[in-house]
Amino acid sequence: MVDDSAVVRQVLVNVLNDAADIEVIATAADPLLAIEKMRKQWPDVIVLDVEMPRMDGITFLRKIMSERPTPVVICSTLTEKGARVTMDALAAGAVAVVTKPRLGLKQFLTESADELVATVRSAARANVKRLAARVTAAPLEAEVKHTADVILPAQSGRAMAQTTERIVAIGTSTGGTQALEEVLTALPRVCPGIVIVQHMPEKFTAAFAARLNGLCQIAVKEAANNDRVMPGRALIAPGGKHLLLRRSGAQYFVEVLEGPPVNRHRPSVDVLFRSAARAAGSNALGIIMTGMGDDGAAGLLEMRQAGARTVAQDEQTSIVFGMPKEAIKRGGADRILALGAMAREIVTQLQ
């Protein structure tokens, strides 16, 4: 646990040590102290702040990834600057991001403690050597579990208007920021409209979209309510909001809305995929990529049953082979592809 705030360190340590399968073996106020302690006992996961004295978190992260690749979870503030620096950290090899405890400690323990524990567990399973190679080349009250049905409106039963416009729906989680960068930067300007759910806290997705927009030939933006899904543009679900695909005549739009977490996530891949099955049917391509858990597995199956082409990322190129594995297990994927083949599959949708 590396953070220059003693208060933050103590809060995070208490949360993680309360989990039966997690032990915090050391804390440090800066990366230089962390290096000394890690030489004595190397951790399975590092939780890292990005703005610290003596050595910043990004420099430390790059050092770790080049010398001894280890899963790193970034713990960042909900500020514009914090979001930008966090994107740099994810690009440098961090596997996930969580938000720092703010003044409302009780609110953090209620809303974010479980997310922190789940993120650290997920990071421990990450194939970080593959990620490094790519970079260099318990709740306070009973949990209520929801399915995408609580977000999706009731089906009207009316036949969909005919359209030939193709869309692509992508869902991903741990390791997904790097995977999305690899896929989207490989796309030409002429490609189908894309809608994306990447599990990420609110405030960070706008910076993520802006970074991709500067790297890609296609346009990339954080989705806003009623944005049209257009060829040559990717819309990324805002953190903390669900993203649905809608049809109006022969055009597709997105709806951004509140609602309870689905499969413990908001945004949820299942919500996007199931809405795509209903709105686009056989005109859609569904892609599920690296991530822990089963979010998106049910939705990908529904897309396939609606006539869509569906793809799961293979185990060899996944940082965490959880979500794709579950989708394959349930029969939702009609193809299993390496990450490097995803862009070609998207372009094929135009044909």
UniProtKB/Swiss-Prot annotation:
According to UniProt, the reaction catalysed is:
[protein]-L-glutamate 5-O-methyl ester + H2O = L-glutamyl-[protein] + methanol + H(+); L-glutaminyl-[protein] + H2O = L-glutamyl-[protein] + NH4(+)
* A biological process term (GO) from this entry: chemotaxis
Q: What is its EC number?
A: 3.1.1.61, 3.5.1.44
Q: Which InterPro entries match?
A: CheB-like, CheB_C, CheY-like_superfamily, Sig_transdc_resp-reg_Me-estase, Sig_transdc_resp-reg_receiver
Superkingdom, natural source = Bacteria
Keywords from the named record: Chemotaxis, Cytoplasm, Hydrolase, Phosphoprotein
The residues covered by the Response regulatory domain are 1-115
Which residues catalyse the reaction? 173, 199, 295
Name a GO CC annotation attached to this entry: cytoplasm
PTM: Phosphorylated by CheA. Phosphorylation of the N-terminal regulatory domain activates the methylesterase activity.
Report the CDD domains cross-referenced here: CheB_Rec (cd16432), REC_CheB-like (cd17541)
Q: One Pfam family from the UniProt entry?
A: CheB_methylest
Give the molecular function GO annotations: phosphorelay response regulator activity; protein-glutamate methylesterase activity; protein-glutamine glutaminase activity
Q: Which positions carry 4-aspartylphosphate? A: 49
Q: Where in the cell is the protein located? A: Cytoplasm
Q: Which residues form the CheB-type methylesterase domain?
A: 161-351
Q: What does this protein do?
A: Involved in chemotaxis. Part of a chemotaxis signal transduction system that modulates chemotaxis in response to various stimuli. Catalyzes the demethylation of specific methylglutamate residues introduced into the chemoreceptors (methyl-accepting chemotaxis proteins or MCP) by CheR. Also mediates the irreversible deamidation of specific glutamine residues to glutamic acid.
State the family named in the UniProt similarity comment for this chain.
Belongs to the CheB family.
Q: What is known of its domains?
A: Contains a C-terminal catalytic domain, and an N-terminal region which modulates catalytic activity.
- The protein's name is Protein-glutamate methylesterase/protein-glutamine glutaminase 1
Q: What is the lineage of its organism?
A: Bacteria, Pseudomonadati, Pseudomonadota, Gammaproteobacteria, Lysobacterales
